[in-house]
Amino acid sequence: MSLSKLVSIKHDEAHTFKRERRKEARPGELLDAALDLFVEKGFAATRAEEVAARAGVSKGTLFLYFPSKEELFKAVVRENISGRFTEWAQEFAVFQGSTSDMLRHCMMTWWQRVGATKASGITKLIMSEARNFPELAAFYQQEVVAPGHALIRRMLQRGMDSGEFRVLDLEYAIFSITAPMTFLIMMKHSMGACVPQGYPLDPERYIQSQANNLLHGLCTREGARKAEQKDAPKAPAATRTVLPAKGKQ
């Protein structure tokens, strides 16, 4: 085999390998582009050709992977949120510590992994457009809301079983936890994006404050005492003053 033919074969193999790698990466690139546009513009205003253009492919290529804009949206939700529930359930199962600690950990972890990311804009999108797209709202309820509530219900039940939490109306106590987190998302993707920099709403301080308020309502007296001790800043060690004995002053 001549050298030129060997070089040509190697070039073709490299080109094929590069094309295959590009093909494998394409669904992820489309999902990233779709997430960006859905959060920026909303579901109704985002056009399939815009997603394709941002991902650097044709509209026909987009529909090879995702047959409709609705299926594309569902894939975005699964990739960024609902696909993580298995991982979160595993973390729940092995968590060591009190349920008060677990509640604080879950709220802060949720913010770091979802709330602080672009994916949190999906929640705002659903809240804004659910009435116009009931099928997508039902999908989000099934894929995100229901499993999320199931994990919170398990956490609250854990607290009641251990005696840390008082007897709760579980179905409604869940909303005491989700409501402040939903507010934080809505603020981030609405007024928070418009107000001057330095607006006094630090997400981590807000979550710590909400967790403390929640625990005051959820905990039994003994559980609240332990939670307060855990959260209270450590006082400086007391110093002891030794007075001289009489006659030795």
Please report, for each region that a protein language model flagged, where it lies by residue:
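Amphipathic, non-transmembrane alpha-helical scaffold segments
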Residues: 23, 31, 77, 137, ...
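Conserved hydrophobic residue
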Residues: 43-44, 136, 165
